[in-house]
Amino acid sequence: MKKISLLLASLCALFLVACSNQKQADGKLNIVTTFYPVYEFTKQVAGDTANVELLIGAGTEPHEYEPSAKAVAKIQDADTFVYENENMETWVPKLLDTLDKKKVKTIKATGDMLLLPGGEEEEGDHDHGEEGHHHEFDPHVWLSPVRAIKLVEHIRDSLSADYPDKKETFEKNAAAYIEKLQSLDKAYAEGLSQAKQKSFVTQHAAFNYLALDYGLKQVAISGLSPDAEPSAARLAELTEYVKKNKIAYIYFEENASQALANTLSKEAGVKTDVLNPLESLTEEDTKAGENYISVMEKNLKALKQTTDQEGPAIEPEKAEDTKTVQNGYFEDAAVKDRTLSDYAGNWQSVYPFLEDGTFDQVFDYKAKLTGKMTQAEYKAYYTKGYQTDVTKINITDNTMEFVQGGQSKKYTYKYVGKKILTYKKGNRGVRFLFEATDADAGQFKYVQFSDHNIAPVKAEHFHIFFGGTSQETLFEEMDNWPTYYPDNLSGQEIAQEMLAH
């Protein structure tokens, strides 16, 4: 009996050793991913070269997730850790500080992709109570097929760089999957290009990139949860809003309860449908063979319930106030004198980043968001605006140093007043005027700052005008406004800041 027990113990030990050495035995990479889209895209690229594990399963809200000690240990034991973006997995930056970078390779799936500003999302959804949740920047790029392709490409390139011996396999797998995503993109483009109604109403404000890339407009509403009926007061507001805007469908992230669907139908005359944000797949979905592409196809079918019907543009419940000081709307009495210390610091021109293509994503967003100009037209407009040969400006409380063509020129300045200018669009701006006390200041004799502020405050960036003739001559310059940001920011960081404001 003792011999049998010893044999069993030995076999168990061998089994445990074999399990712990599985990576070495099968030669596969051990990759840990955060939530479903990241898992799916990574798995498609890695194929048989890796054991790809999903950290955040169905029933757990990715926005709210905090890794357990066991989950952290799992990541620390991986070859590669893949996440989407710190604006989605907000816990990742702290985790990265603890990782052994030599042992665990990290991939941020969004790479250098710029994100749109975030905002307050749905109230009462995801069990968030009354406040909803907030992203500084909107991370939901995977819900646009054309951007999903970019995520897959970045995962492919990152894995290939980290494991060059497997590059050929990664590229082959990615190409096959990207072909499917391109078909999905084509289906969305063709299915939505002739939309009769371009606005859709959703309880989960996750579809902004999808809307932007396919010519639609997402209108998010608050105070609705798929499994709870709204209060009588909220229902009355919704009823008025739905009827005023002739809304046919409200989209939820999961099937609304029958009670809620009946209430909305009876009281507001609106139907409900599902737009799945694909943050997870349920066990039932997985067993049914659902995946990213099949769910996105269902999302398209659901969207067409709205876009195939004629209807007026749907306005948000709460209109955004665009007449702000930053946009050029203010009272004269609010304009106050400022000192050079508001601009103190070391600044870099943004013009080189326009030239090297860093800002191309910014111009693409502007074209899609406004519809006023194409991406190429925006780039031409900003090329004229940003153009300058002054690469750096270093400012103290009373001096400015201009770095031009490798030469440094430094002068002392005094404040000489302010000027309110009215623009063609009807909005206004304030220029704060400075004059060099040095007789040899030349083209830097007269300087004007415009930073979208009208009273003393530390500038985050500024547009500058300078010349050697007079302040009055500079007032006439409206097309060239060299722009400067702190010199410790990368071009990528500046581009993201531009989208945030």
UniProtKB/Swiss-Prot annotation:
The signal peptide stretch is: 1-18
- The lipid of kind N-palmitoyl cysteine is covalently joined to C19
Lipidation positions, renumbered (S-diacylglycerol cysteine): C19
Q: How does it sit in the membrane?
A: Lipid-anchor
Q: Does the keyword Acetylation apply?
A: no
Q: Which family does it belong to?
A: Belongs to the bacterial solute-binding protein 9 family.
Q: From the Swiss-Prot or TrEMBL record, give the protein name.
A: Zinc-binding lipoprotein AdcA
